[in-house]
């Protein structure tokens, strides 16, 4: 005949080691009065069960500081202060005046040199003329002498001079350009000077 089995609640045997105490909170910043002493009960606890040891509750709960971060942040140096560069020094007003005067004088000298070079070039291109004068001088002198009787019976010699002058001027003008073509012009001028009668009177006693 089978025996009836009764099940009773099972209790674990008491351990010989005390449980680990809970972490103690950090001391408060201000001093609080100590808690009243805990008095144990007069009757001993049952041998098979021991209550866990709990610390007395604090009269005022204090906030715990946050735990430190497991990964510390690298320390970054502060950025250097922003320094504005000093403004460039303002040039003296006389400096600009000197530059303008020098540039003006240089431009004037350059223009004068350019004008002189252009003048020389045009002078070379201008026609160069050579002038040759040929003068022909022809003079004819005719002398005629006569003796006449004067009013008082004396003899008078009369000399008649006839002078014939021919002046011929021949001007040859040659104009030569810088180009190969040559121009020549010849001008002939004839000047005839004729004085037909020159009378000289000579008296003879």
Swiss-Prot record:
Residues 189-205 have a biased composition (Basic and acidic residues). It is a single-pass membrane protein. It is found in: Cell membrane; Secreted, Cell wall. Residues 13-88, 176-205 are annotated as: Disordered. Expressed preferentially in differentiating vessel elements in seedlings. Keywords: Cell membrane, Cell wall, Cell wall biogenesis/degradation, Developmental protein, Membrane, Secreted, Transmembrane, Transmembrane helix. This is Protein TRACHEARY ELEMENT DIFFERENTIATION-RELATED 7. It comes from Arabidopsis thaliana.
């Amino acid at each position: 005949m089978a025996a009836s089995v009764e099940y009773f609640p099972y209790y674990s045997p008491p351990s010989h080691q005390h449980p680990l105490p809970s972490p103690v909170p950090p001391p408060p910043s201000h001093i609080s009065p100590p808690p009243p002493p805990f008095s144990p009960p007069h009757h001993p606890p049952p041998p098979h069960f021991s209550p866990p040891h709990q610390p007395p509750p604090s009269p005022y709960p204090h906030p715990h500081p946050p735990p430190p971060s497991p990964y510390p942040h690298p320390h970054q140096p502060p950025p250097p202060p922003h320094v504005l560069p000093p403004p460039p020094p303002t040039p003296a007003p006389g400096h600009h005046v000197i530059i303008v005067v020098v540039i003006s004088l240089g431009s004037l000298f350059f223009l004068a040199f350019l004008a002189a070079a252009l003048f020389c070039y045009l002078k070379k291109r201008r026609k160069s003329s050579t002038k040759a004068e040929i003068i022909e001088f022809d003079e004819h002198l005719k002398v005629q002498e006569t003796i006449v009787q004067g009013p008082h019976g004396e003899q008078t010699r009369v000399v008649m001079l006839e002078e014939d002058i021919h002046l011929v001027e021949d001007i040859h003008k040659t104009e030569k350009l810088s180009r190969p073509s040559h121009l020549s012009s010849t001008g002939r001028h004839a000047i005839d000077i004729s004085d037909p009668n020159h009378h000289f009177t000579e008296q003879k006693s």
